[in-house]
């Protein structure tokens, strides 16, 4: 049995629990379990909810059938301690676990990238004892680090984080690369992902990554409020959104690259929530990142199809993952494609430029093996492409500072690995659009604090609890400390 996962929607009035139960034998004979939730340890005013149960998948080797059980608990109040318990297969109930709702006024959330539990397994998927043992060892190690990251992040907030946002790739093994293309191979990895005790009481909003996208097993473990068919890749569902306090979070499944559908989804989500102060988009691919994937044509092509829609819908912040290295951009506006290229161009040049040579473990930044003065036609075309996707003209303010006031553009942030299961080197030529980046092969996490007029980001490494970047704040509105400025309208100011 896996631990419950909670998600939040609309000012803590709803909590969503997803329980995946391992049921032996015929699923038709298995009654849907119940969840009980009430106030305080004595579960005062307890409510009972019967799970919505659906068939999940079957382990063809053991004939173990799995079902997915999901519950929506309604009417929860902010700043209240609840306890919940759910029914097990034998009819008994779990020990009550605490779930404390938080404030929806000034609040904090944790942002992480690519836990990718199981990725430290270097063996390719095969139906062998060696593979399954290596996978088990990797899950153990990656889950330990994932647990450490979540605990440190929660401690950093004083236990007050309202939820976690994950930028995708919860697990490693895709269905395509599983032995026999089995849906079940990833189950041990989801068990590892859900194993930290803190997740009994910490809601998680997940994003679909490329390692999640081809296996419906993802959908059996997570709830996605206000889900849409728009952005669906036909396997794990489409885009979804939720609101928390003054913020609209729009979670895009960009494994479907149909930008028009994502545009339509965002317009619908905003129309349903027009008064939110902050608009945050989360997607997997690092469309403005700075590590190995960031210069790939398929990533930059996705950038130029999505960015105009983000800007037209007044998105404030875009949170991404995929590249297992931290980066934060300048405020950007108006990035657009200036040269034509296809998704599969420059593969050889990208590999050559990023090749770290004989000692890759000692490098955190690729060595730039293609010289700027190369006369090779393929190299010249590649370097011209890199220059075109630097987006120098999109930088709203190139000064480095801690606070940006009333920006017109968007901040893009890419999360490093949160488990240490895999890292990528930074590209050798830092893009013009990057304000700061970091890679030292240590897991990191970000704590984001939100108020009515500020959105503040701090990012930490887990080995020594130190920040890897300065505190960065977006501020909306003219505040007392800048009212004396001798301009009619304060915009794009950094101080």
Regions found by a protein language model. Give the residues of each.
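Extracellular low-complexity, Gly/Ser/Thr-rich intrinsically disordered linkers
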Residues: 247-248, 283-287, 431-471
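Generic beta-strand structural signal
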Residues: 111, 166, 243-244, 450, ...
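C-terminal cell-surface addressing/anchoring modules of secreted/extracellular proteins
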Residues: 487-495
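Divalent metal-dependent phosphoesterase catalytic cores across multiple superfamilies
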Residues: 1-207, 213-236, 260-271, 294-313
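Conserved acidic residues
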Residues: 162-164, 277-279, 316
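Extended active-site neighborhood of metal-dependent phosphoesterases/phosphodiesterases
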Residues: 73, 81-98, 133, 178-275, ...
């Amino acid at each position: 049995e896996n631990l419950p996962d909670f998600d939040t929607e609309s000012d803590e009035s709803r909590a969503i629990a997803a329980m995946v139960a391992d049921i032996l034998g015929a699923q038709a004979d298995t009654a849907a379990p119940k969840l009980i939730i009430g106030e305080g340890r004595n579960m005062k005013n307890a409510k009972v909810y019967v799970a919505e149960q659906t068939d999940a998948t079957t382990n063809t080797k053991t004939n173990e059938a799995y079902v997915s059980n999901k519950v929506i608990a309604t009417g929860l109040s902010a700043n209240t301690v609840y306890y919940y318990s759910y029914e097990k297969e034998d009819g008994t109930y779990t020990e009550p676990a605490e779930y404390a709702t938080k404030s929806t006024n000034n609040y904090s959330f944790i942002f992480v990238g690519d836990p990718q539990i199981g990725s430290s397994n270097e063996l390719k998927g095969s139906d062998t004892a060696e593979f399954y043992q290596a996978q088990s060892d990797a899950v153990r190690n990656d889950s330990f680090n994932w647990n450490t990251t979540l605990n440190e992040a929660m401690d950093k907030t004083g236990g007050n984080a309202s939820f976690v946002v994950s930028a995708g790739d919860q697990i490693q093994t895709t269905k395509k690369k599983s032995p026999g293309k089995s849906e079940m191979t990833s189950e041990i990895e989801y068990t590892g992902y859900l194993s930290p005790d803190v997740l009994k009481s910490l809601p998680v909003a997940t994003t679909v990554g490329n390692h999640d996208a081809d296996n419906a097993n993802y959908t059996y473990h997570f709830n996605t409020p206000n889900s849409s068919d728009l952005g669906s890749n036909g396997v794990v569902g489409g885009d979804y959104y939720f609101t928390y306090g003054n913020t609209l979070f729009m979670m895009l499944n960009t494994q479907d690259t149909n930008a028009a559908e994502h545009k339509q989804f965002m317009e619908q989500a905003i129309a349903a929530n027009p008064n939110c102060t902050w608009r945050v988009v989360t997607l997997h691919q690092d469309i403005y990142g700075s590590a190995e994937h960031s210069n790939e044509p398929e990533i930059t092509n996705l950038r130029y199809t999505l960015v105009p829609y983000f800007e037209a819908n007044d998105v404030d912040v875009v949170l991404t993952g995929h590249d297992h290295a931290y980066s934060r951009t300048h405020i950007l506006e108006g990035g657009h494609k200036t040269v034509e290229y296809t998704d599969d161009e420059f593969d050889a040049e990208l590999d050559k430029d990023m090749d770290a040579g004989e000692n890759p473990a000692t490098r955190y930044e690729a060595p730039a093996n293609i010289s700027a003065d190369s006369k090779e036609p393929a190299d010249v075309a590649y370097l011209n492409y890199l220059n075109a996707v630097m987006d120098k003209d999109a930088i709203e303010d190139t000064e480095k500072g801690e606070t940006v006031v009333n920006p017109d553009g968007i901040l893009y942030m890419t999360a490093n690995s949160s488990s240490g299961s895999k890292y990528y080197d930074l590209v050798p030529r830092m893009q013009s659009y990057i304000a700061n980046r970091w890679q030292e092969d240590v897991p990191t996490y970000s704590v984001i604090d939100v108020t009515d007029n500020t959105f503040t980001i701090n990012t930490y490494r887990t080995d020594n609890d130190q920040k890897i970047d300065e505190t960065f704040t977006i501020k909306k509105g003219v505040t007392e400390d800048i009212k004396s400025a001798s301009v009619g309208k304060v915009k794009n100011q950094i101080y």
